[in-house]
Structures are given as C-alpha cells and as structure tokens.
Design a protein with these regions (language model features):
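Short alpha-helical "recognition helix" segments of helix-turn-helix
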Residues: 20-21, 49
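Residues within the alpha-helical elements of helix-turn-helix
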Residues: 12, 23, 52
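A short, Lys/Arg-rich alpha-helix, primarily the initiator
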Residues: 1-15
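DNA major-groove recognition helix of helix-turn-helix/homeodomain DNA-binding modules
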Residues: 44-59
C-alpha cells in the first residue's frame, strides 16, 4: 500500500532524491526509503519536503 507520493512529486518537479536529501540534511538512503514507502516521514519532515517542492502537504500523500 502506498502511503505517500513523494517519488511521483519529485519526478513532476524534476528534483532528484539526492537533491532533496541534501536540502533536508538527510542521507540518500533515508529519502529513498520514503520514496519507496519502506519508511514514512514525520509530519514535520513532510511539511519541509512540501516547502522545498513548492507543493501543499496534501499533494505528497494523496492523488490529485
């Protein structure tokens, strides 16, 4: 079951997982785990990701 859409939004925004990891100060493997839905980010981190990608948090968790 997919719980987040981070990977899809990264593709839409043409931002790599490596770029996002650097901007968040996280490792690539952590971001990759979020993108693969192996781990879920906290709401606080999800909000940071939304800010970086210029989307609302809802766009990261549900289909439009």
């Amino acid at each position: 079951m997919k719980l987040n859409r981070i990977k899809l939004v990264l593709v839409e925004k043409e931002v790599s997982q490596t770029e996002l990891a650097k901007k968040l100060g996280k490792s690539f493997s952590t971001i990759n785990a979020y993108c693969s839905n192996r781990k879920q980010p906290s709401l606080e981190l999800l909000n940071e990701i939304a800010d970086i990608l210029s989307v609302i948090m809802k766009d990261l968790i549900v289909d439009k």
